[in-house]
Amino acid sequence: MQYIPFLISGLVPVALSKSLFEATSNTRIDGNDIAAIFGPVLTPEAHIFLPSDGDYDDNVMARWSTFNDPSYVATVKPATETDVQAIREYQVSTAASHNITFFATGGGHGVKLNFGNVQNAINIELSLLDFIDLDLDNEVVTIGPGVENAQLYDLLSSVGKETALTGERCVNTIGPTLGGGLGPLYGIRGPQVDSLVSARLVTASGDVITVSRSENRDLFWAIRGAGANFGIVTSATYRIYDQTNGGMAVSAQFAFAPAVNRSVFDLMESMNDEYPPGMSGGMILSYNHTTNEPSVQWNLLFMGSNEDAQPWLDKIQALGPIDSSIRNVPWHRRDEPEVPYCERGQHYILYNLNLRRTDAATLQSYFDSFVDFSSKNPWFDCDLMYERQATDAALAVPLSERGVGPWRDSKINANFLVVTPSEEYDEAADAFVRPFMDRFQAVMGFDTLHVYVNEALGDEGPASWYGEENLPRLVALKQQWDPENKFGAGAPIPLSL
């Protein structure tokens, strides 16, 4: 697999039991009734698709991963905010008697254990809400939940602007914001939530409200890091900025012989205390089952001038890469394949850890075991994506202005992206990955578990996603805005402590 250094981005404390891998089902509603139920309350532009329709797969977005994925009796594609509100109002008034579960889908990239418990649901797919309203006078842009990064990247670049986005062009824009949002501008603009000005939200009661620093301020704090727990966002407004370095970046990819892996790890460790704000990316450790050899790569994107990037490029080139590419590219286009994050329908499992430092010896221990395990198990495909991020901009925001997203001091966002042929291999893959996550956490982690909620598997616990100190406030808001726990299936806020 190719490495993508910026994710839509954890010790997982217990092994995955068989029960966690098995889904439970709700009482099934007849899909043929869905059109009769929702047809009268939706606008003509909205669509309803049933799995029995011959064109269902052509019209309904496939999820990125098949791991513990939800199942649906129907997909409703609202065309307006009014449609979303009507669906929610129906659930409030009658869904309990029909035992209907609803599941909102923005980009479908989330991978969570508990999604497997969402069965026979109605999928609210938001892809038709793909509007963009650019307001240059006020330096903001408002978008719908169906917008993908590529649409916003290209529009902003055409007018000399930027905002903090995740890295992949194919990924939904609003979805990652709700969990914080890491991307190539993190060291300069901070996480996505720092650029969020306001949002329109359909709540569990079916009301449509605005959340911002001046309206529903407490809820605005909560949706900036725990947003999936409080409703369906129907639009979001972001602050925009003049492009960094005139919109040009230095994109570099390096490949190394496996024998020099320790030198690569040592270099990453040397960056524990110094890292430029404009640089993002990191190492990818993988295994090629065709050549039966491991792969060591270092990919980076430097949002700045060639002169500022060169000292850092020199450090990497001094290791003697066997292949390299260094180019100037427009920031919004990128310069590398976006597989795997743009390839849907594979059996991906994603584990995440946020770390405070790098320890080369720990990485070496993992690499040696990983190569041995991969060589003996041709079904096992895993990328360790080890991303270094500058914390300057994120930590500069005053505490009173921050959202709930807690781990601004994390220097490393580490992801184990596992691909297996099918679910029968999940537990064996899990048994290999977990001990190394324990080791990473013990040696390179914080005193408490830090997990980036967008990339969390879902069994780590709310303290690891949202911060122990934030839970009392979050629980109170959950009780106020979603007392029946309709939202947040993947990384839920509890209704009590």
From Swiss-Prot:
Induction description: Expression is positively regulated by brlA, a conidiation-specific transcription factor involved in the early stage of asexual development and necessary for conidiophore formation. Expression is also induced by the cell wall integrity (CWI) signaling pathway that includes the mitogen-activated protein kinase mpkA and the transcription factor rlmA. Expression is negatively regulated by the transcription factor sebA.
Gene Ontology cellular-component annotations: extracellular region
Native source species: Aspergillus fumigatus (strain ATCC MYA-4609 / CBS 101355 / FGSC A1100 / Af293) (Neosartorya fumigata)
Name recorded for this polypeptide: FAD-linked oxidoreductase fmqD
Any single GO BP term: fumiquinazoline C biosynthetic process
Keyword Glycoprotein annotated: yes
Position of the signal peptide: 1-17
Protein function: FAD-linked oxidoreductase; part of the gene cluster that mediates the biosynthesis of the antitumor fumiquinazolines that confer a dual-usage capability to defend against phagocytes in the environment and animal hosts. The simplest member is fumiquinazoline F (FQF) with a 6-6-6 tricyclic core derived from anthranilic acid (Ant), tryptophan (Trp), and alanine (Ala). The trimodular NRPS fmqA is responsible for FQF formation.
Superkingdom of source: Eukaryota
Entry-listed glycosylation sites: 99, 261, 288
